[in-house]
UniProtKB/Swiss-Prot annotation:
Natural source organism: Bordetella avium (strain 197N)
Record's keyword annotation contains Membrane: no
PANTHER family given in the database record: 30S RIBOSOMAL PROTEIN S2 PROKARYOTIC AND ORGANELLAR, SMALL RIBOSOMAL SUBUNIT PROTEIN US2M
Stated name of the protein: Small ribosomal subunit protein uS2
Any GO BP annotation: translation
Family stated for the protein in its record: Belongs to the universal ribosomal protein uS2 family.
Length: 249
């Protein structure tokens, strides 16, 4: 099935009510039907391919992409696809300063990892009942807030965002730090601050699943390319080494 057909079936082309539109999205709008803007899927396909190409190249260089989707329709889909391709994700609330104040976030990650060790080695069982309850409450809170980024050792190399209106702070923080943003932008939002725009429906679960799967697939393809490149380098290196030995003999 062609990508455009998939997008059509997932309802990617359905924008928001015309009265809520953002004029900056005009280049990506085909028209309107029953007071709802219809997104030009030819534009979406081209922009989506640009975005996945960027992600693939970034992943091939060993880069990390932070998946961001905290609204109800996106949470589970974003977390599942990020985990599938081994990337960090934020599926609960975006904490202000998650990027711009990463030093503080790192100390929370350190605490979470220490707590996980306590659970793994059984030392948590030595706590009193009250301490145990407080411990579990803190662990749950940390897991919900930063569980998806606990293996992120530094700032990400890019952000993939579902719904820029919902994640204005995340996009603004990425802009401040010069981190490229790949984002799904619906007809009611501004594409400002987004480096790789995917014009499309940001409410439908089927549409969100399509975007998240596509970005995750691009990451996996890039990673595979990276591994193949390393294998080729090693093989070439071995051949050169053998030739040097032959010359010496």
């Amino acid at each position: 099935m062609s990508l455009m057909r998939e997008m059509l079936e997932a309802g990617v082309h359905f924008g928001h009510q015309t009265r809520y539109w953002n004029p900056k999205m005009a280049p990506y709008i085909f028209g309107h039907r029953n007071k709802i803007h219809i997104i030009n899927l030819e534009q979406t396909v081209a922009k989506y391919q640009e975005a996945t190409k960027f992600v693939k190249q970034l992943a091939a260089r060993g880069g990390n992409i932070l998946f961001v989707g905290t609204k109800r329709a996106a949470r589970e889909l974003v977390a599942t696809e990020a985990e599938r391709c081994g990337m960090p994700f934020v599926d609960a609330r975006w904490l202000g300063g998650m990027l711009t104040n990463f030093k503080t976030v790192k100390s929370s990650i350190k605490r979470l990892k220490e707590m996980e060790v306590m659970v793994a080695d059984g030392s948590v069982e030595r706590l009193t009942k009250k301490e145990g309850l407080l411990f579990q409450r803190e662990l749950d809170k940390l897991n919900k807030a930063i569980g998806g980024i606990k293996d992120m050792n530094g700032l990400p190399d890019a952000l993939f965002v579902i719904d820029v209106g919902y994640h204005k702070i995340a996009v603004a923080e990425a802009r401040t730090l010069g981190i490229p943003v790949v984002a799904v932008v619906d007809t009611n939002h501004s594409p400002d601050g987004v480096d790789y725009i995917i014009p499309g429906n940001d409410d439908s679960a089927r549409a969100i699943a399509l975007y998240a799967k596509g970005i995750a697939d691009a990451v996996l393809e890039g990673r595979e390319q990276n591994l193949n490149g390393l294998v080729e380098e090693i093989v070439e290196g071995e051949e050169e080494f053998v030739e040097v030995q032959d010359g010496q003999a």
